[in-house]
């Protein structure tokens, strides 16, 4: 199993994938201005160059098989407000020339698929399985069409009620209209009865959809309305908290305080799949605790520790030496670590809060203390996940809380295209395995 672009990349032997550094060098040669100024010496800012609206629209135009002008007009106003048509066309034309003359040639995801469609030979495969077909854009469908000509059996799976990427070019009707035998899997193994009732009420409001029967599990489940995320019983259990936009998860200044609430209370969480307390941070702390209690750790554990100790506590050159040491399982004691691996002896008596004060910020140190006092597990997967609805697609949890707020752009879009919003909340609500909490909108 692989993504469509990964398949095309492998089959076509493509080696160079578009990255922020490529865009930086392109801008240095052509002197274009994007929608904002980026710090060219910052790794994260460099990567965000690829996500600038100009390059997003250019990539989406390829994915949706449209001109950049058509794509710009199909893009939500908030994303294209700083994009000028003349500049867009100039950048698109110059970028295509630049990427093709580069050695090796630079490929975006859409370029990889286009390369296979125009030049590739379908491999000899007997069965083709296409999943999440309701989210495929036109270019992906052209890839499916090409592969299907030489394949004996094709399975295309999807649910048009969960087509939440139409704004980005997905064509669920292509999936619904695809010729062949239709098999409806009408039994849910996730959704309990009370959650199913809410989901059905939403799906029936979708005007353009394939009618289908969909039965819930035997369990009743629960549906609860609350006026604030602070009233959610987040102290225990597995949770998935969903919102339409990312700022609704983290912008406390606008009254959206779920992230702050979790931090203040010491509840372990991930935000759009990124852990608030990374694995490496806990591995370093555990190695420090083990070294001070047991007196010995492995070289691998020492590497975890050195990742966070930094130069203040390790002599010059030894961090790289330890990280490159191939004998990860070798046991070393305190004295060996001081004599042979460069640990500064004076730091051994310090508590973890002191020794990691330069590498773990004060907010996270306070959070870790609260979480440990709560007897929370900071090693395993965080029991609370906060996410946008689009990021959580495919996920599930025993307890799901859905913030019912809409952004101004969504409110405006809902007037003309209500189906997209109905599908979005259908997806959100059907993540619940047992208990659904609906958090009333602030707006």
Residue ranges and their predicted role:
Residues 4-7, 127, 134-221, 227, ...:
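Conserved helicase motor core of SF1/SF2 NTP-dependent helicases
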Residues 6, 193-196, 240, 246-437:
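Core RecA-like ATPase module of SF1/SF2 helicases and allied nucleic-acid translocases
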Residues 23-24, 42, 51-54, 68-75, ...:
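Short amphipathic alpha-helical segments that mediate assembly, nucleic-acid/protein binding
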Residues 36-129, 138-143, 156, 166:
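Accessory N-terminal region flanking or inserted into the helicase ATPase core
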């Amino acid at each position: 199993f692989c993504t469509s672009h990964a398949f095309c990349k492998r089959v076509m032997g493509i080696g160079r994938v578009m990255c922020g550094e490529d865009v930086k060098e392109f801008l240095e040669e052509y002197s274009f201005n994007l929608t904002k100024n980026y710090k060219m010496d910052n790794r994260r800012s460099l990567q965000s160059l690829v996500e600038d609206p100009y390059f997003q629209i250019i990539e989406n135009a390829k994915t949706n098989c449209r001109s950049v002008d058509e794509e710009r007009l199909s893009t939500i106003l908030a994303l294209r407000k700083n994009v000028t048509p003349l500049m867009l066309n100039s950048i698109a034309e110059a970028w295509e020339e630049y990427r093709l003359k580069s050695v090796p040639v630079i490929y975006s995801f859409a370029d990889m698929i286009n390369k296979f469609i125009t030049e590739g030979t379908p491999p000899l495969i007997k069965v083709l399985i296409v999943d999440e077909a309701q989210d495929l854009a036109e270019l992906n469908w052209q890839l499916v069409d090409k592969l299907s000509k030489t394949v004996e059996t094709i399975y295309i799976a999807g649910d048009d009620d969960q087509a939440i990427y139409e704004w980005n070019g997905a064509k669920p009707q292509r999936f619904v209209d695809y010729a062949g035998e239709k098999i409806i899997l009408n039994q849910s193994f996730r959704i309990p009865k009370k959650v199913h009732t809410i989901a059905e009420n939403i799906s029936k409001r979708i005007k353009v959809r394939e009618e289908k029967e969909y039965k819930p599990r035997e369990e009743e489940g629960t549906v609860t309305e609350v006026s604030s995320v602070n009233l959610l019983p987040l102290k225990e259990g597995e949770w998935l908290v969903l919102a339409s936009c990312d700022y609704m998860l983290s912008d406390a200044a606008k009254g959206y305080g779920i992230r702050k609430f979790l931090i203040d209370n010491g509840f372990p969480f991930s935000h759009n799949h990124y852990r608030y307390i990374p694995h490496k941070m806990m591995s370093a702390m555990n190695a420090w605790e083990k070294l001070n209690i047991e007196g010995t750790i492995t070289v691998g554990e020492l590497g975890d520790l050195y990742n966070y100790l930094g130069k203040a506590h390790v002599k010059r050159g030894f961090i790289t030496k330890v990280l490159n040491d191939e004998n990860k399982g070798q046991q070393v004691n305190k004295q060996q670590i001081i004599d042979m691996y460069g640990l500064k002896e004076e730091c051994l008596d310090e508590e973890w809060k002191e020794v990691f004060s330069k590498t773990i910020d004060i907010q996270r140190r306070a959070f870790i203390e609260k979480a440990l006092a709560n007897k929370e597990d900071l090693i395993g997967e965080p029991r609370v996940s906060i996410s946008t609805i689009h990021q959580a697609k495919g996920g599930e949890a025993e307890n799901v809380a859905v913030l019912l707020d809409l952004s101004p752009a969504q409110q405006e879009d809902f007037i003309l295209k209500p189906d997209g919003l109905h599908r979005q909340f259908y997806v959100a609500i059907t993540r619940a395995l047992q208990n659904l909490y609906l958090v009333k909108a602030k707006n």
